Amino acid sequence: YEEFIFDPTAFYLTKYLPRVLGIFDGMEELPYLPGLHYFRLVGGMRAFAKPRVRAALEKIMKAAEEVERFANVHVEFTNRMTAQGFPTSHISTSVAPYDLIADYFRGATGTMKDLYRNKDELLEMLDKATVFLTKQTIAWSRASGHPVVFFPVHWAPDRFMSQKQFETFWWPSFRKLMINLIDAGIIPMPLWEADCTKRLETIRDIPPGKCIYWFERTDMVKAF
């Protein structure tokens, strides 16, 4: 928590990405860039000549070229389908801040323990995650030219945490993210997976007509 909260970018480049993506192996040898200054800026560039860092950068560029080719095929397909009268419901996707942490950093067991053992750190990380998720989601949506952003909701269902915990840890950051997107002219479209009936009263606190709610399984009478 401490490293991520202090400098998420450094944590991503030197810790997280080398662990989850093989092409980033070697990036942990990068210097702590914000500490470079004056002649240290020049000297610090030596790190990019290290064999493992050079190999990582070459792999990253090669992978990026493949992703670019895939993206171009996807854009061409989407445009062709739209021209034939089948526009996509959405192009961009994003994730709730709590789900980002639970799915990709701490895991189910770790995050559930954090609800009791690391409350302050979890809340601070949620605040930080909300900021960069807002920026990245707006950028993705505008680049796609489609105003709807899809959110698969993983950790909001009734069985995963108490209502008090939901209102403390899960909902505030997601609501803030959705409001930020709405203010930017974007339409959030979360899919509330599993049963979220107990959450209905809370999640109604959003500007009417500004988002689309999907429900996998809930009391639709109460939902309406």
Describe the predicted segments one by one.
Residues 1-224:
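Catalytic cores of TIM-barrel enzymes
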